[in-house]
Regions:
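ER/secretory pathway lumenal C-terminal domains and tails of membrane proteins involved
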Residues: 1-163, 170-241, 246, 252-308
Length: 308
């Protein structure tokens, strides 16, 4: 497989999942066509464009999916189009239909962004130069990451956050789409009424997006993570500069937040064992932090520095 052009399947533990996305035989080595099929259907469509369309067209729900038609797909809010792609959405259980992550934008942000791309490209040589810069930002923070990561199927969580930079770039094009609409009306010397209607339409887009996404992004009165970290820190001994060992992100971030932001128990030393195998983290732990001394590590830097 590694000798073929542009191999994308590399993890033998994911062989069954690869086959599910590429349509290959269960006990056969993947072909060039199957590699490209996997790249297009999973890595591009499912793990990038699906996230992109969540943000600018609409989202079915916030249930993590594995390709099934009822979980985590993009939708438009236009019934006949969504039903054509995913089946009759009215047949979904209420728990999915009323999911807070069910957000519909009717594709309006996408259309404005495409208009912005067209407007920028048609503004002469300078517009094309500006487009190339913005497109490079869009590509390198989106599709280039897809190419580099070469992800296996069955990721432990949705990965849309990895491509936020490209979504920001497209949001710039959305703004240009509004400018393009104004420029078009200015050139046609449109009357005040059409201009006003167009501005209301453009204003409707962010209002619709905010109204749809507010309930699933509202963090009001959510203190579980904060309280979790504070409780851990406050139960440690008051004296002696205690050390708390933790493992992984969810164990660690509530502790860091409480110390760094709310200044809770800054005499406690937090040690994340997931990082303990790295030279930079060992050095950090040897240094004092806030009111806590460094960890009593007797090695000097030459003994654990990578490459020495």
């Amino acid at each position: 497989t590694q000798n073929m052009l542009f191999p994308r399947m590399w993890n033998d533990r994911s062989a069954a999942s690869y086959k599910g996305w590429s349509g290959g035989g269960a006990n056969e080595a993947p072909t060039q066509k199957e590699n490209l099929t996997y790249f297009i259907t999973y890595q591009l469509n499912y793990m990038y464009w699906r996230y992109f369309l969540w943000n600018f067209v609409g989202r079915q729900n916030d249930i993590q999916g594995s390709g099934e038609p009822e979980h985590g797909n993009w939708i438009t809010g236009i019934s006949w189009l969504d039903n054509l792609r995913l089946g009759d959405q009215k047949l979904l259980p209420e728990s999915l239909r009323e999911n807070k992550g069910h957000n519909v934008f009717y594709g309006l942000p996408l259309l404005l962004g495409l208009l912005g791309i067209y407007w920028q490209w048609t503004r002469g040589k300078k517009g094309k130069q500006q487009f190339s810069v913005l497109f490079f930002l869009f590509f390198m923070t989106g599709l280039a990451i897809v190419l580099y990561l070469n992800q296996t199927p069955g990721q432990p969580r949705e990965r849309d956050y990895a491509y936020a930079g490209s979504f920001y770039a497209f949001a710039i094009w959305i703004g240009m789409g509004v400018a393009g609409c104004c420029d078009m009306l200015r050139r046609k010397q449109a009357k005040i009424l059409p201009v006003g209607l167009l501005m209301l339409l453009c204003l409707f887009v962010p209002i619709q997006m905010a109204s749809q996404t507010w309930d699933d992004h509202d963090r009001s009165n959510r203190y579980t993570c904060r309280d979790f970290g504070a409780n851990y820190l406050m139960t440690l001994p008051d004296k002696g500069n205690p050390i708390i060992f933790c493992n992984g992100d969810n164990d660690t971030f509530p502790l860091w937040y409480n110390q760094d932001t709310e200044e809770v128990r800054r005499d406690v030393r937090i040690c994340n064992l997931s990082y303990a195998q790295t030279d930079w983290y060992i050095y950090q732990q040897q240094c004092p932090l806030y009111d806590a001394p460094g960890l009593p590590i007797s090695w000097d830097q030459n003994q654990y520095q990578e490459g020495k």
